[in-house]
Amino acid sequence: MSESHSLGKNGERLAIKYLRQNGYKVLEKNWITGRKEIDIIAEDDEFIIFIEVKTRMADFQLHPRDTVSVHKQRNIIFAAQTYIQRNEIEKEARFDIITVVVEGAKHELEHIKDAFYPTL
């Protein structure tokens, strides 16, 4: 496993731990439809939440949230629509980003709710 892949998987583990500690129910990890993937699908009482996790080292020049391109957002939205249809979900959808910035043995996690909208 490459170092960046390992870093990303660690970020996803931290994100899932955070979500569970904050009352979210994690439904899926790395859910794939065709060539599109959603890192985490979770829910709370009100929303079905599609979450992109971005993990970077502290010395990376861009903040992780700035690396989620419009193209990536469209792919997540398309995959989310497929998931909602296949599973007959009736809750309102929300699209979040969780960023994890790693510096040595420490990390900083940020949960950005409503990070983007399906009107793209």
Regions found by a protein language model. Give the residues of each.
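Domain-level recognition of nuclease-like catalytic cores that cleave nucleotide substrates
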Residues: R86-L120
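Short acidic/glycine-enriched loop/turn segments that link adjacent beta-strands
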Residues: T33-K36, A105
